A protein has these predicted regions:
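Bacterial N-terminal signal peptides that target proteins for export
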Residues: 1-7
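Residues within alpha-helical transmembrane segments of multi-pass membrane proteins, especially transporters
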Residues: 8-10, 340
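C-terminal motif of bacterial Sec signal peptides marking the signal peptidase cleavage site
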Residues: 13-16
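Charged, low-complexity intrinsically disordered terminal segments
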Residues: 18-459
Length: 459
């Protein structure tokens, strides 16, 4: 799928080339004395409440200062609020995500909103998603679906027709057929988001598509070819309960209106949600229509300001110049920078482009680990043990230039420690790339890397 995106959409883009914006070297600089701004379910938190929050989110005395620094820097570049009072739960791989999704959908009382790049009739514990959604619709629960036209091009039309006939509102995002487009024909603008919102109170966001690739025995066309064993897909999602869910709801309805979805009955889409936990979350929606690629700016500013460590995973590592500079500069100033990257992918060219950057990364001191015996699809970042991100954005050009993305930034030590524990498991199953052996790779491999670089903007 990824290779097909690059080929077909990349050819279209040649007529009007775009590139990732170069960011100012001073981006994200903020005074450490600037008071972080945090909102709760009843509005802005006081200085005393913010102070108590940062103390609670820090496990070590030194973490408090790091946390305040990252809060101030992120505040200078992000346009969405940092929301306190959240409960977050990391979900490892498709099985855990689908189980959490199906549980939330099954408990829905008012509405279910789903927005996914790939939307297939996945199942969990023997229950099909389509059957569950239609059953909830039969109970009077509103069900609204946005699926990306390109990402879900392999999903049978009959599946969406069945949902519509059962009363589910279905919107096709940026139809590949220009005759069906309602918001202007822009085939390169793809909805890469993965969002579930239930009753305006619970949400799941991250890298997991509604794809049968995550199942032991894939049934959709996005899975392994017939007769071939299914490959394990490694991915990460985040379940959020609390006031920050409203931001994901806003993003969903922004796309619904943009794509001229049918007018919906007011079902209390934004209920008053009391604090459910102690996490602080910032939801960042990015779009090529915006003047600033918000998550891109945020993650680069976080890496540029790192003092101790940067740990990141990416399904498609096709770094922009600013991403390369941020990673190598951090390593050169003594920050431990570790990257978890795939050695196999549904986009071989993205692997080749990533490989073309390894020499510079290794020379700067970046530690690179490649997974094996699985397909890495996770997009996560941890900085200084206090700043964490889980979402749909990769370290690539497409996430900046063409895709609509959504990422959740969680501030505090607890989530960072959970993610680091996941990384520890991943390191154990990965192999390290060493500078000496990497320099001895074949001329054929180097030639493949150079060729793939021609297409890196669209990968």
């Amino acid at each position: 799928m990824r290779a097909l995106v690059a080929l077909s959409l990349g050819l279209v883009a040649l007529a009007g080339c775009a590139s990732a914006p170069r960011l100012s070297p001073t981006l994200g600089q903020a005074s450490t004395g600037e008071r972080p701004k945090v909102v709760g379910s009843h509005g802005a938190l006081s200085s005393a409440q913010v102070k108590a929050l940062t103390a609670r989110l820090s496990l070590e005395p030194g973490d408090n200062a790091l946390l305040k620094r990252h809060m101030a820097i992120e505040q200078a570049v992000a346009e969405s609020p940092l929301v306190a009072g959240e409960t977050t739960h990391l979900l490892r791989d498709g099985e855990a995500t689908f189980r959490a999704m199906f549980a939330a959908i099954g408990a829905a009382k008012h509405h279910i909103n789903l927005e996914y790049f790939i939307f297939e009739d996945v199942e969990s514990d023997g229950v099909k998603l389509g059957d569950l959604l239609l059953a909830k619709r039969g109970e009077g629960v509103a069900v609204n679906v946005i699926y990306d036209s390109f990402g879900s091009s392999d999903t049978p039309t009959a599946f969406f027709d069945r949902l519509r006939q059962g009363g589910v509102n279905v919107v096709e995002y940026n139809p590949m057929n220009p005759l069906k487009s309602k918001a202007g024909y822009s085939p390169n603008d793809r909805d890469h988001r993965k969002i579930l919102v239930v009753d305006g109170a619970v949400a799941i966001v991250g890298g997991v598509n509604l794809s049968t690739t995550y199942q032991a025995h894939p049934t959709g066309k996005s899975g392994s070819p017939p007769g071939e064993p299914a490959e394990h897909w490694r991915d990460t999602d985040l379940e959020i309960t609390g006031p920050a869910v409203a931001r994901l709801q806003h993003l969903f309805f922004d796309h619904w209106r943009e794509q001229h979805g049918p007018e919906l009955q007011d079902l209390n889409w934004y209920p008053a949600i009391a604090p459910t936990g102690g996490a602080a979350v910032r939801i960042i929606g990015s779009s090529p229509d915006g003047a600033t690629p918000l998550y891109y700016v945020t993650v680069i500013s976080a890496i540029r300001s790192a003092e101790k460590s940067v740990t990141a995973s990416a399904a498609y590592f096709v770094p922009t110049p600013d991403e390369m500079d941020a990673l190598t500069d951090a390593a050169r100033r003594g920050v431990e920078v570790r990257l978890l990257l795939p050695d196999k992918s549904d986009s071989p060219n993205s692997i080749a482009v990533g490989h073309s950057h390894y020499a510079d990364l290794l020379a700067a001191g970046v530690k690179i680990f490649e997974t094996h015996d699985l397909v890495l699809h996770s997009k996560t970042v941890v900085v200084d043990g206090v700043w964490s991100a889980v979402g749909s954005s990769n370290l690539d050009h497409r996430s900046v230039i063409f895709n609509d993305e959504v990422d959740a930034v969680v501030l505090g030590s607890d989530t960072a420690q959970e993610l680091e524990a996941m990384f520890a498991d991943d390191w154990a199953a990965a192999h390290a790339i060493h500078r000496t052996t990497w320099s001895q790779r074949s001329l054929g491999a180097r030639a493949k890397e150079l060729y793939a670089r021609v297409w890196e903007m669209w990968l």
